[in-house]
Amino acid sequence: MHFHFCSKHSIKSAEKSDILKQQLIIIISNRKEVRQLSQHKNIRTASEEIQWTSRTYGAVIVLIAGLCLLCLGAFLSISLGAADIHLRTVWEAIFHYQPTKTSHQIIHDLRLPRTAAAALVGALLAVSGAIMQGMTRNPLAEPSIMGVTSGSAFAVSIAFAFFPGLSAMGLVLWSFAGAGLGASTVMGIGMFSRGGLTPVKLALAGTAVTYFFTGISTAIAIRFDVAQDISFWYAGGVAGVKWSGVQLLLIAGAVGLTLAFFIARSVTVLSLGDDLAKGLGQYTSAVKLVGMLIVVILTGAAVSIAGTIAFIGLIIPHITRFLVGVDYRWIIPCSAVLGAVLLVFADIAARLVNAPFETPVGALTSLIGVPFFFYLARRERRGL
């Protein structure tokens, strides 16, 4: 492999170039061969010719299997509840809807939007986590851990207290603002910390900001008597979601996921390190800005509809990288599908684990996510 680096320094620059080339070979290749690059006049032209070797067939299998599981989960989610409905009735209600039948009304007005919301929220949170982990090179990054979710819930609590008649779209906009506030606060604390931004330090900053926003939200809830409304957001769940909420999720998802696919290749390079990304001619600041905008859009929409559902954005990206490799052109769609599958089945379990009462779905995702977080934190203990 030949790279032409324009170096103004002699020994140090050459050593640094060798290290960067080794990182590129080891990480991008994912233990597969990287195709030979012909000689180029500059590094930017060379970077355009890099053939990203990825587990393409594995990614396609993951997508197909994930979509099949999602369809199965959707039918189960629609059929199971306070009153079980036969799968044939579910099929008829979806494809031959008759508004005069009570069972069809229950499916169309209650269970279908709930299932659609669960799938969309899971997908949005999973992609948010994948983007955050790629941008920060932090395996612990996730909307609920990095203060994004709590910032969004904090803004929602303000909206409930001071603007009780706010529309659904207005609530989403407040949620967006809170998500941006939470993310910028955590990043600001991390940047000024001693020793720089290590994964565990960033996670600790996110935890501190989360508790701060949660404390203020609780005080607002008590002072303005909106605790009952806010408790839904902190419990997390998709029960009672209407078609209007699904439409908002679809709009936010279309915008956020389109932007995510647009910067997927850049996030792949950025996940290998800022120095390498800059050496390949990438505008890292612009990529991070767009990436943070994506996280704010996706997380803000998810929290405004379903509340603070934690750890989906932590678990799913790690599973996806294990299955499909490091190419974010595959990580993003596979994370979306697997995130949707996880939350749909978690919502089913939330209805069954303590029937006839419902368990908050956020409690079930936390039950899975907390041990996984401790495992990752233990693995990253050297970053303290």
From Swiss-Prot:
<comment type="function">
    <text>Part of the ABC transporter complex FhuBGCD involved in iron(3+)-hydroxamate import. Responsible for the translocation of the substrate across the membrane.</text>
</comment>
<comment type="subunit">
    <text>The complex is composed of an ATP-binding protein (FhuC), two transmembrane proteins (FhuB and FhuG) and a solute-binding protein (FhuD or YxeB).</text>
</comment>
<dbReference type="GO" id="GO:0033214">
    <property type="term" value="P:siderophore-dependent iron import into cell"/>
</dbReference>
<keyword id="KW-0812">Transmembrane</keyword>
<feature type="transmembrane region" description="Helical">
    <location>
        <begin position="154"/>
        <end position="174"/>
    </location>
</feature>
<feature type="transmembrane region" description="Helical">
    <location>
        <begin position="296"/>
        <end position="316"/>
    </location>
</feature>
<feature type="transmembrane region" description="Helical">
    <location>
        <begin position="176"/>
        <end position="196"/>
    </location>
</feature>
<dbReference type="GO" id="GO:0022857">
    <property type="term" value="F:transmembrane transporter activity"/>
</dbReference>
<feature type="transmembrane region" description="Helical">
    <location>
        <begin position="243"/>
        <end position="263"/>
    </location>
</feature>
<keyword id="KW-0406">Ion transport</keyword>
<feature type="transmembrane region" description="Helical">
    <location>
        <begin position="357"/>
        <end position="377"/>
    </location>
</feature>
<comment type="similarity">
    <text>Belongs to the binding-protein-dependent transport system permease family. FecCD subfamily.</text>
</comment>
<keyword id="KW-0813">Transport</keyword>
<keyword id="KW-1003">Cell membrane</keyword>
<feature type="transmembrane region" description="Helical">
    <location>
        <begin position="202"/>
        <end position="222"/>
    </location>
</feature>
<dbReference type="Pfam" id="PF01032">
    <property type="entry name" value="FecCD"/>
</dbReference>
<dbReference type="InterPro" id="IPR037294">
    <property type="entry name" value="ABC_BtuC-like"/>
</dbReference>
<keyword id="KW-0410">Iron transport</keyword>
<dbReference type="GO" id="GO:0045121">
    <property type="term" value="C:membrane raft"/>
</dbReference>
<protein>
    <recommendedName>
        <fullName>Iron(3+)-hydroxamate import system permease protein FhuB</fullName>
    </recommendedName>
</protein>
<feature type="transmembrane region" description="Helical">
    <location>
        <begin position="58"/>
        <end position="78"/>
    </location>
</feature>
<keyword id="KW-0408">Iron</keyword>
<dbReference type="InterPro" id="IPR000522">
    <property type="entry name" value="ABC_transptr_permease_BtuC"/>
</dbReference>
<dbReference type="GO" id="GO:0005886">
    <property type="term" value="C:plasma membrane"/>
</dbReference>
<feature type="transmembrane region" description="Helical">
    <location>
        <begin position="330"/>
        <end position="350"/>
    </location>
</feature>
<feature type="transmembrane region" description="Helical">
    <location>
        <begin position="115"/>
        <end position="135"/>
    </location>
</feature>
<keyword id="KW-0472">Membrane</keyword>
<keyword id="KW-1133">Transmembrane helix</keyword>
